[in-house]
Every structure is written in C-alpha cells, then in structure tokens.
C-alpha cells in the first residue's frame, strides 16, 4: 500500500484536489465525517492507522467480491482532512462509486453506502476506544456535473480548517517478469 500526502493551504488547491477526483472517476462518492477522540487530541499516527485500517478492510472486501462477482477497479482512496491536532477532526473521503456499487451487482447504492459508514465507524473504534466517527453527509457526483452535489461537495471541502492534509492511498500495480527458457 502506498500513501501520498500533501499539506495544502490555498482554497484553489482544495478545489483542484476535488476536481481531479471528479475528473478521474465517472461516478464519485464522497463522505464528509467527523472523528472524535474520547482520549484527547487526535495525532498523526492515529489518523494514519485509521486510514490504513479502512483501506485494508475495503481492499479485503473488494478482493473477496472479485472472486464471487464482477471484478472492480483497483482500490484508490482520496482523503482530505483538517491538520490541526484537536480532539475532533473533520474529513472527506472520496472514491469511485463503482468500487462499492458495481453496476451489475444487485445491491443498491444506499445499502453499499451504509456498509461504507459501518467500515468507517469500525475502523475508528479500533483506533480510538470510546471515540466516535460521525458521518455528516454523503455526496454522489457524476463527471461533468457542475451543480447540486458538486457545488455542495466543494463547499464542504472549502469549509475545512486550513491547512488541510490531502492523501491518496492505493496499492501499486505489481509488475510480472516473463522468463522464457532458451
């Protein structure tokens, strides 16, 4: 798994990060949520462990589904979160809707989104005993949509306290070497 992080403090950079996600995925799902710690300030190690744990759970779930149903694209998660180290941190998680809601699956978007919320909450409970992960809003944005959900998503992203940390988490493609007998 590879994590690429950047600290950004300009509203234009935040808009660009959101636009890149919308441009990358034809159907984007985003979750705006708040992490609360009952143990005091949330530190960088806890956030890293949370993101890693969530990614692993998603990857395992998708790998399992790929064996029983239609394959999905590689797991890529984009995160946007406040940098400050308080007991509460607001976050955005962005990913392809097809990652969870495969067009040929019989499960609805609402059912799959409910499972995403459960995974977020379970991941945070492991990291912060007694803490809470409260999902505030879900966004569904189609590529080319410049109103409604897209505007609401950008507004929420821009409401995060500056500077913010962006992260992209993915598993690099493993290259295979073909060896031929001489």
Where in the sequence are the language-model features?
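Generic structural signal for short, solvent-exposed loop/turn connectors between secondary structure elements
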Residues: 1, 38-41, 83-87, 130
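Catalytic "initiation/cleavage/transfer" segments centered on a nucleophilic residue
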Residues: 1-25, 97-182
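A structural signal for short, well-ordered beta-strand segments and their strand-loop junctions
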Residues: 32, 88, 133-135
